[in-house]
Amino acid sequence: MQTVNYRKGLGAMSVCFFVWGFQPLYWYMCTNVCGEIDTFFIMACRIIWAAVACLCILKVQGKLPQLWAVFKDKQVLKREMPASVLLFGDWLVYLWAVQNGRVLECSLGYYIQPLVVFALGAVIFREKMNWRHFVIIAIVVVGIVFSTSGFGGVPYVTIALALMFSIYAAIKKSLTIDSIVSTTSEILMMVPVALLFILLFRMGDNGMGSMTVIKQLLMIGGGVITGLPMVFYSIGVRHLPLMTTGICQYISPSLSIICGAIMGEALTREKLVSFLFIWTGVILYVLNTVYEEKQKKKTAAE
């Protein structure tokens, strides 16, 4: 039974990160098809349709009462509101980067994000660090510094995504509510802003006035590919060890590199060297995690 659950969890988690990894191609297609429609309008549509998709998922799962409970709990809202702001910023920067041919910077940001989370854990939650952790972080920092040459300047997209999502993850760590319920509440908090933006600035030809059936379907699809992976993620988290989940999350940025190549971004020598430093840090981080997990089991057995 345990093996079946593990396979179920691994399959669900793989689907989740594969969808996230290939998302740049979807948003790139939206940009090409929608043409004159800008990042902000696509962002607003993504929020609205993601909210619809997540609400439908919660309805099917019978978790809507849990969602309404979130909005009645002031202590939970104090954490969910800043999480919503950070998620909004992450989505906006990500969409802008995809539309402006900077997918590789996104990939770099999501590679280092788990390491930034670890560093934040040491600072905020007083989690212990040993000399191996400092070596890993130093290697990653060198990679980021080197990326200023490969990307023609400071990789603001990389830094912004890594920091925002890391702080977001730190906030989520302090929450005990269901992951889909939590994310849905954060998206619902964005909906008024999205609706107000469309009503005030995008009712003409630069927005709703130019929406054909195809464009509308693409926007709806954007909501689906935002909400649906969360279902698979929640299944995976329930059936997989935390260490396996941590390793799986590197699927997404790896696939994003492929997306960048398909979209015409050049992986220059300078960029490759930067990625090599990051990959080295990631590999050492994973190996160290495996080693520490084995040591814990060994200590517990004694």
Regions found by a protein language model. Name each.
Residues 1-41, 142-174, 259, 297-302:
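Glycine-/small-residue-enriched transmembrane alpha-helix faces in small-molecule transporters
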Residues 1-15, 51-81, 131, 188-219, ...:
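Membrane-interface interhelical linkers
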Residues 2, 47, 150, 250-302:
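C-terminal-most transmembrane helix of multi-pass membrane proteins
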Residues 14-22, 26, 81-98, 160-171, ...:
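Hydrophobic alpha-helical transmembrane segments of multi-pass membrane transport proteins
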Residues 25-39, 66-69, 99-102, 144-145, ...:
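Membrane-interface helix termini and inter-helical loops of multi-pass transporters
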Residues 30, 42, 46, 81, ...:
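Hydrophobic/aromatic residues within transmembrane alpha-helices
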Residues 45, 107-112, 179-189, 227-261:
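Helix-helix packing/entry segments at the starts of transmembrane helices
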Residues 96, 113-132, 254-273:
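C-terminal transmembrane-helix exit sites in multi-pass transporters
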